[in-house]
């Protein structure tokens, strides 16, 4: 098994790391639920995989804490807390779109840049149904959320708590919906079907458009809707 993993790693280095972004878009290697090794070290590779429910275990308590702080420490009314919470949720939708479009789909020129891009997002396009790489691993989500917390803290002052709670709630919605669009085939609701079709087109037809995952509104605003 170890030799098989090493061989995949070597193949990725030779075949994909130097040419992740193909002329037609992101190349799909497999649509099965299989997980390719990104590192020769099994320990490092473990940190690149995560079960879908892990973000809930980490961040639901964070959301609850900041809602509690909003009401008890900063004495916001429930109405104001909800209003600011929804504001944070709205901010997330913009960040989600911008990150996906300009960071995850940035086309690096250098070899290290291409390796990093493949580990961050290219592997998801190559193996779109890998159930262990559909939500953000804690090694990425915790540092990023910490950075955004301080951003809210320094910019929004006492309003940071409900805004940040809504922002993290938006992130969890994104993670859960992203996983669901790939694996929750039992959900038949029309809104979810439309969201799933939108994301599947991004993977299988037009990776240069359709960057919204939990919401399609910013694709409409910034004219990155599908052309046909």
Question: What are these model-predicted stretches?
Answer:
Residues 190-197, 203:
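Functionally important transmembrane alpha-helices
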Residues 1-164, 176, 208-228:
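Non-catalytic, topology-defining segments of multipass membrane proteins
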Residues 181-192, 208:
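Interfacial helix-loop-helix junctions of multi-pass membrane proteins
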């Amino acid at each position: 098994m170890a030799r098989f993993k090493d061989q995949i790693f070597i193949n990725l280095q030779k075949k994909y790391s130097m040419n992740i972004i193909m002329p037609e878009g992101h190349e799909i290697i497999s649509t099965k639920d299989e997980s390719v090794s990104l590192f020769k070290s099994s320990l490092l590779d473990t940190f690149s995989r995560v079960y879908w429910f892990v973000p809930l275990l980490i961040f639901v308590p964070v959301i609850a804490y900041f809602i509690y702080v909003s009401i008890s420490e900063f004495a916001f009314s429930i109405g104001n807390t909800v209003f600011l919470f929804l504001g944070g949720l709205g901010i997330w939708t913009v960040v989600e779109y911008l990150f996906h479009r300009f960071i995850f789909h940035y086309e690096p020129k250098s070899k290290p840049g291409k390796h990093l891009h493949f580990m961050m997002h290219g592997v998801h396009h190559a193996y779109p149904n890998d159930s262990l790489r559909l939500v953000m691993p804690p090694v990425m989500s915790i540092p990023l959320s910490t950075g955004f917390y301080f951003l809210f803290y320094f910019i929004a002052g006492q309003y940071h708590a409900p805004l940040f709670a809504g922002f993290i709630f938006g992130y969890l919605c994104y993670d859960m919906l992203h996983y669901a669009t790939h694996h929750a085939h039992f959900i038949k609701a029309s809104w979810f079907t439309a969201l799933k079709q939108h994301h599947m087109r991004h993977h299988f037809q037009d990776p240069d458009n359709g960057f919204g995952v939990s919401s399609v509104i910013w694709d409409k605003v910034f004219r990155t809707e599908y052309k046909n």
